[in-house]
Design a protein with these regions (language model features):
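Catalytic cores of nucleic-acid endonucleases
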Residues: 118-170
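Acidic-basic catalytic patches of nuclease active cores, encompassing PD-(D/E)XK
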Residues: 39, 49-96
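A generic structural motif
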Residues: 169-177
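Nuclease-adjacent, charged terminal/linker segments that flank catalytic cores
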Residues: 1-51
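Short glycine/proline-enriched coil/turn segments at helix->beta-strand junctions
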Residues: 89, 108-111, 139-143
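Hydrophobic, Leu/Ile/Phe/Ala-enriched alpha-helical segments that form helix-helix packing faces
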Residues: 24, 31, 80-88, 135-139, ...
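Short acidic/glycine-enriched loop/turn segments that link adjacent beta-strands
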Residues: 99-102
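Conserved catalytic cores of phosphodiester-cleaving nucleases, focusing on short active-site segments
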Residues: 105-122
Length: 177
């Protein structure tokens, strides 16, 4: 499955979400087998170092940590396009899941950019601040969005960043669906 897609209709996202969820189910079954057939130390070594999970889009075997990170980023991106579609219902969007420079979500011929991530903390790897600074430097685009999920970002944090970066809409999802 391509890691760059153009979404013309919000219903097109269902195919990708279903693929991701099916591959996560496959991964859960593989993980259960590892747990059933190994002691704790061996199981955790396998989880960390071997390709024992299913990559969420391609279905190829991949490292568990990569699968966890990719699945959540893909799902956040889908949720972001669903969010943007409510604001811009006639706009087609490009979702870029490749690991290359650029933005995660851009319109087909429009003035919107978005970045997406999930992390154990919004401070992890400085991702939020790096994205916001990069957005602030982009004076050509008028609609900028940061979409993410974590467990410790509060309304106080949002206000702090909103004051610092007033031209960027920060959207912290409450759950990943």
């Amino acid at each position: 499955m391509s890691k760059q897609i153009v979404v013309h209709n919000i219903n097109e996202l269902d195919k990708y979400k279903n693929t991701i969820l099916n591959n996560l189910n496959n991964s859960a079954n593989m993980l259960q087998q590892v747990l059933n057939n190994n002691g704790a130390l061996d199981a955790f070594k396998i989880f960390k170092f071997e390709k024992i999970a299913t990559e969420p889009l391609s279905g190829n075997l991949e490292n568990l940590i990569e699968v966890i990170n990719q699945a959540h980023t893909y799902l956040i991106s889908i949720m972001a396009v669903e969010y943007l579609n409510k604001l811009y219902p006639t706009q087609a969007f490009i979702i870029d899941w490749r690991n290359i420079p650029g933005y995660d979500i851009e319109p087909v011929g429009g003035t919107i950019i978005a970045e997406c991530f999930s992390a154990t903390s919004y401070k992890s790897n400085g991702k939020l601040v790096a994205d916001l600074k990069r957005f602030a430097c982009n004076t050509e685009v008028e609609n900028k969005y940061e979409f993410f999920y974590d467990k410790d970002f509060t309304e106080n944090h949002k206000e702090y960043y909103r004051e610092k970066y007033p031209d960027i809409e920060i959207v912290k999802f409450k759950d990943i669906k």
